[in-house]
Regions:
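Conserved RNA-binding domains used in RNP assembly and mRNA/RNA metabolism
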Residues: 2-80
């Protein structure tokens, strides 16, 4: 996937998530997932997004984050 994203870009990502089950005979398959957020960092191995954050760091630097392995990403679109 050759889309150049930068820190702070708002993005939409479709990706395949791992599924797991213990002591089961289920025929598991990866689960299709989607997320929107702001790029915190991107490497050849993963992309890390903030999915919920405070508008100013004056209040709090805490945020919700997700790191997705690049090999799981099926679609990445810059939305803002």
């Amino acid at each position: 996937m050759k889309i150049k994203v930068s820190k702070g870009d708002a993005v939409y990502i479709e990706w395949m998530d791992i599924t797991a089950d213990l002591h089961s005979d289920a025929k598991l398959e990866p689960a299709a997932a989607e997320v929107m957020g702001w790029v915190d960092s991107v490497t050849r191995k993963y992309i890390r997004l903030s999915t919920c954050r405070y508008k100013t760091s004056e209040h709090c630097e805490l945020k919700d984050q997700i790191a997705i392995p690049m090999g799981c990403v099926e679609r990445l679109e810059i939305i803002g």
